[in-house]
Amino acid sequence: MNIRPLHDRVIVERQEVESKSAGGIVLTGSAAEKSTRGTILAVGKGRILENGSLQPLDVKVGDTVIFAEDRGTRAEKIEGKEVLIMSEFNIMAIVE
């Protein structure tokens, strides 16, 4: 299944986070944090500005990004992978 985000939205595959503490204890449930890092799988065409022009996105497919977990992301399952659909505004940094 192909999925194409609209406007300034992107599709991010969340990267796995280590499920053990520094002391070797396996974390479960609420103690295990979800990663706020992921890989961009698809990007929309850009943000439409007030004057009607299109502003392209700063991120591109393949970028590793750090995003805000609590900022309106929506988790979906696509082809067995957990992906997030979010606005580029919710991405805080590109990892280079």
Swiss-Prot record:
- Which GO cellular component term is one of those annotated? cytoplasm
Pfam families given in the database record: Cpn10
GO biological process entries: chaperone cofactor-dependent protein refolding
Gene3D superfamilies assigned to the protein according to its UniProt record, in alphabetical order: GroES chaperonin
Q: Where in the cell is it found?
A: Cytoplasm
Molecular-function GO term, any one: ATP binding
Sorted alphabetically, which keywords does the UniProt record give?
Answer: Chaperone, Cytoplasm
Which PANTHER family does this UniProt record tie to the protein?
10 KDA HEAT SHOCK PROTEIN, CO-CHAPERONIN GROES
What family name appears in the similarity comment? Belongs to the GroES chaperonin family.
Q: What does this protein do?
A: Together with the chaperonin GroEL, plays an essential role in assisting protein folding. The GroEL-GroES system forms a nano-cage that allows encapsulation of the non-native substrate proteins and provides a physical environment optimized to promote and accelerate protein folding. GroES binds to the apical surface of the GroEL ring, thereby capping the opening of the GroEL channel.
- UniProt-listed NCBIfam families: PRK00364.1-1, PRK00364.2-2
HAMAP family membership:
CH10
Q: Report quaternary structure and partners.
A: Heptamer of 7 subunits arranged in a ring. Interacts with the chaperonin GroEL.
Protein's recorded name: Co-chaperonin GroES
Q: Species name for this entry? A: Vibrio atlanticus (strain LGP32) (Vibrio splendidus (strain Mel32))
Its organism's taxonomic lineage begins at: Bacteria, Pseudomonadati, Pseudomonadota, Gammaproteobacteria, Vibrionales
